[in-house]
Amino acid sequence: MKVENIESSKGNKIANQFVITDDVGNQYFQSYNSMIVKKVNCSNFYKIELDQKYWNYSNTTGKYRNIFLGETITETKKKIKSGEYILTDLNK
């Protein structure tokens, strides 16, 4: 398991915003003590799961979630609506 701070566009490590990679290549975005996103490694693509409660909890969470996913909030909402992204409880 590997834990790293998310980096700003200037390369600075951001406190309390983490990317976690497990031993099978799944990646997680954690903001403070809450899991926000899980990228499930499916060999040649990632299946995205978002925490149903915290995925859009605050502006700060959203800013770093967007960096982690490489997209805007508008794109994320479209993918949730289409079913491409799954809302689930990542903090149970």
Language-model regions: role of each:
Residues 1-92:
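Terminal leader/tail segments of proteins
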